[in-house]
């Protein structure tokens, strides 16, 4: 049973001559890691903003647990490419910030924040200042903060796009570990083809002008990693390479058609 449903979603910004998204149908179910991939102009970020409730669709319906999505809510945790952390607070206060806004008592929210920091392998970082952290560590704090409120689904907006290649791979692997441990459904958007193929249980390819779904792939590479297989072995698997090259060809063809 799907937790999150998008039915015939369209989006058009005021003054624009064409919609940014048209007739999008998606569902996100338990233990699913749904990845949306597409070239510039395919509406990836707009799609995530609609699900997060930051903007309303022009048409169609978005529901979570059967209830319409109407504005932001704590049941949808969001991790941004820009870590959006509070530089004047320490790591613990940043992770506990949403719980503080919700009125959770200090001892309870700090205990939850420490639990989430341990989950993302930052157990010894609670008293660190944000400026003392690397880019990857900041993203771990952002992930811990999103999870602290125990959301029904986790939304990730190109979360590793600003990281170097080595740190990006580390964060991909950490995300799969967290996904396995928490069983949280994840919706992630990315422009990185290998990342999309490695992480997704379902990969949705978007075409631009207007953004629309052109292909869906059911994949198991991330599940294999979560089950204990090494990332190197998975990424050297001929089936992984074949899938990556197929997706690359589709993305390039969409870019050429929209040029």
From Swiss-Prot:
It is found in: Cell inner membrane. GO terms for molecular function: ABC-type taurine transporter transporter activity; ATP binding; ATP hydrolysis activity. Keywords: ATP-binding, Cell inner membrane, Cell membrane, Membrane, Nucleotide-binding, Translocase, Transport. GO terms for cellular component: plasma membrane. It is a peripheral membrane protein. Its EC number is 7.6.2.7. ATP binds at residues 38-45. Residues 4-233 form the ABC transporter domain. CDD domains: ABC_NrtD_SsuB_transporters. It catalyses: taurine(out) + ATP + H2O = taurine(in) + ADP + phosphate + H(+). Its main location: membrane. Signal peptide: none annotated. Pfam families: ABC_tran. The keyword Repressor does not apply. The complex is composed of two ATP-binding proteins (TauB), two transmembrane proteins (TauC) and a solute-binding protein (TauA). This is Taurine import ATP-binding protein TauB. The gene is tauB.
């Amino acid at each position: 049973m799907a937790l999150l449903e998008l039915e015939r979603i369209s989006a058009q910004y005021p003054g624009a001559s064409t919609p940014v998204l048209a007739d999008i149908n998606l569902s996100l179910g338990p233990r699913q890691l749904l990845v949306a991939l597409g070239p510039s102009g395919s509406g990836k970020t707009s799609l995530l903003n609609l699900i997060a409730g930051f903007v309303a669709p022009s048409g169609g319906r978005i529901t979570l647990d059967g209830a319409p999505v109407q504005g932001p809510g704590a049941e949808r945790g969001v991790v941004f490419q820009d870590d959006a952390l509070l530089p004047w607070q320490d790591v613990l206060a940043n992770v506990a910030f949403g719980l503080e806004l919700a009125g959770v008592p200090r001892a309870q929210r700090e205990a939850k924040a420490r639990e989430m920091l341990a989950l993302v392998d930052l157990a010894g970082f609670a008293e660190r200042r944000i400026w003392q952290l690397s880019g990857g560590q900041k993203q771990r704090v952002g992930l811990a903060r999103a999870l602290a409120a125990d959301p029904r689904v986790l939304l990730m907006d190109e979360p590793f796009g600003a990281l170097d290649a080595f740190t990006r791979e580390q964060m991909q692997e950490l995300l799969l570990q967290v996904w396995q441990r928490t069983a949280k459904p994840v919706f992630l958007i990315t422009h990185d083809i290998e990342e999309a193929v490695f992480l997704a249980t379902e990969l949705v390819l978007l075409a631009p002008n207007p953004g629309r779904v052109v292909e869906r792939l059911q994949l198991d590479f991330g599940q294999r990693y979560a089950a204990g297989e090494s990332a190197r072995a998975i990424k050297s698997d001929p089936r992984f390479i074949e899938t990556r090259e197929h997706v690359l060809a589709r993305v390039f063809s969409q870019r050429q058609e929209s040029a």
